[in-house]
Swiss-Prot record:
Its EC number is 3.6.4.-, 3.1.21.-. This is Terminase, large subunit. GO terms for cellular component: viral terminase, large subunit. Nuclease activity requires 2 Mg(2+) ions per subunit. Also active in the presence of Mn(2+) or Co(2+). Residues 256-438 are annotated as: Nuclease. A motif (Walker A motif) lies at residues 125-131. The record marks 300 as: Modulates nuclease activity. It comes from Thermus virus P23-45. Its cofactor is Mg(2+). ATP binds at residues 97, 99. GO terms for molecular function: ATP binding; ATP hydrolysis activity; endonuclease activity; metal ion binding. Residues 22-197 are annotated as: ATPase activity. The lineage of its organism: Viruses, Duplodnaviria, Heunggongvirae, Uroviricota, Caudoviricetes.
Length: 485
């Protein structure tokens, strides 16, 4: 199937002004387009335009947006809905039917305006939102086009075994978009279509290994929005280097999966072991302290890290296991009192009401910071990693602490999502205790961590649809023939 391309006239119908990278994507006729772009660079918007164009330019076309989760698929799906509803007002020989809960959109095509006497339906185009976490639900369809969003987070087997076969009968096209996540299959597909020569951030980009069916596009966020370059460079001060290079620089970074790439910047302090405590320094009346408390469950350890807010150093760390809730709280209270009644930042998630009630009963000054989701955990860990890269994290020079930091890694789940956890059957209690403590630290450059609000899992129609548009229409005459009376 020959891929049609949109005209400038079609862009005008949508009020859409594509930037240079979006325009290159729209003008490409490759069957497999791979777009590796930084965050907020318009790749999702361009993808929504591609879908709208097919639904109108090819009556009867069938296409899907596939993302790691339904919530992610709903983003582009919502944008497509908004654009389709807008175009339906321009082309009276079309009728839109939306089944939002099923993420299903139908565009009915008629031989004349819908309200004209004798109007007959001649074809129906269909667009659906799908999740890659259930590959078996992707099998069996016959499609004209597929859009893969955040493709780097989708396992290759989902593409090769479930998605690609749906395009075989009609020789359909695929638009594969993502920010990079290491050197996985998305990286390999990108190289198959890259013709831009040697470029920083793309390993082996100077090696010509392209495939005629592929074309790839690459841009950092500031390449797309050069007027905002200063803003992006400021973000680099507040985001771990690896995360910044991947998310905004769109770099394919090869790494050992270690979350803490700044371990060589870690400040190591001599300490004295006192029972279950590693003591770097005793209480100083003129200093302010806080304690990051990660309570142990089952075989986990309980770890309490005392942070000197004036120096940014962990001056005491207590680690224990096998203790009852009451014993853990009693130890925490004693530690707090030893450091001038230091206030506590406690992860109270998953330990029930017992800990909270015990903390209240003991009169401990604490702030609950429940690590109730991967989002909260990632924000806390990213803050710790950033401070470490800046040389602002100081801990006791203890092998257990260093091993736990070194073995805290990124992993990919079966559904393609990226998670952080300890290697193998290791523990992450020290990591979480440190992250909780340093969430209260104002860095030497004035940076202060703030926990961002979590995004709702479901978006209302008005919120999930954006009025920004990106579309492509090859030939307006084709559209006129399809929709005129």
């Amino acid at each position: 199937m020959k891929r049609l391309r949109p005209s400038d006239k079609f862009f005008e119908l949508l009020g859409y002004k594509p930037h240079h990278v979006q325009l290159a994507i729209h003008r490409s006729t490759a069957k497999r387009r791979v777009a590796c772009l930084g965050r907020q660079s318009g790749k999702s918007e361009a993808a929504s335009v591609e879908a709208v164009f097919e639904l109108f330019a090819r009556p009867g076309s069938q296409g899907w947006i596939i993302a790691p989760t339904y919530d992610q698929a709903e983003i582009i799906f919502g944008r497509v809905v908004e654009k389709v509803e807008r175009l339906a007002e321009v082309f009276p020989a079309t009728e839109v039917q939306l089944q939002r809960r099923r993420l299903r959109l139908l565009v009915h095509h008629y031989d004349r305006p819908v309200n004209a006497p004798g109007a007959k339906r001649v074809a129906t185009s269909e667009f659906r939102g799908k999740s890659a976490d259930r590959p078996d639900n992707l099998r069996g369809a016959t499609l004209d086009f597929v859009i893969l969003d955040e493709a780097a987070m989708i396992p290759f087997s989902v593409w090769s075994e479930a998605i690609e076969p749906t395009l075989s009968v009609r020789d359909g096209w695929a638009l594969i978009i993502s920010t990079p996540k290491g050197l996985n299959w998305f990286y390999e597909f990108f190289l198959m279509g890259w013709r831009g020569g040697l470029k920083e951030g793309i390993p082996n980009s100077g090696v010509n290994q392209t495939h005629p069916d592929f074309e790839s596009f690459h841009a950092a966020s500031w390449d797309v929005w050069p007027e905002r370059r200063e803003w992006y460079m400021e973000r680099r001060l507040y985001i771990p280097d690896l995360e910044f290079r991947q998310e905004y620089g769109a770099e394919f970074v090869s790494h050992s999966n270690s979350v803490f790439s700044g371990l060589d910047m870690l400040i190591l302090l001599p300490y004295e072991r006192r029972g279950t405590r590693l003591v770097v320094e005793d209480y100083r009346p003129d200093h302010i302290y806080c304690i990051g408390a990660d309570f142990g469950k089952n075989q986990d350890y309980s770890v309490f890290s005392v942070l000197d807010l004036d120096t940014g150093a962990i001056v005491c760390l207590e680690r224990m296991n096998g203790a009852t809730w009451s014993d853990q709280v009693a130890r925490l209270k004693a530690l707090s009192e030893d450091y001038g009644h230091a206030y506590v930042v406690a992860d109270t998630w998953g330990v029930g009401d017992a800990i909270a009630e015990e903390l209240d009963a003991q009169g401990i000054n604490y702030t609950p910071l429940p690590v109730k989701s991967s989002s909260v955990k990632e924000q806390l860990i990213s803050n710790l990693a950033l401070l470490m890269e800046k040389g602002q994290v100081a801990v006791p020079n203890d092998k257990t602490i260093l091993d736990e930091l070194r073995n805290f890694r990124y992993y990919r789940t079966a559904s393609g999502n990226q998670v952080m956890r300890a290697y193998g059957r290791g523990h992450d209690d020290i990591v979480m205790s440190l992250a909780l403590a340093y969430s209260q630290y104002e860095g030497k450059d004035g940076y202060k961590f703030e926990l961002a609000e979590e995004r709702p899992s479901k978006l209302k129609h008005e919120e999930s649809v954006m009025s920004l548009v990106e579309d492509d229409f090859t030939d307006l005459e084709l559209a006129n023939r399809a929709f005129s009376a």
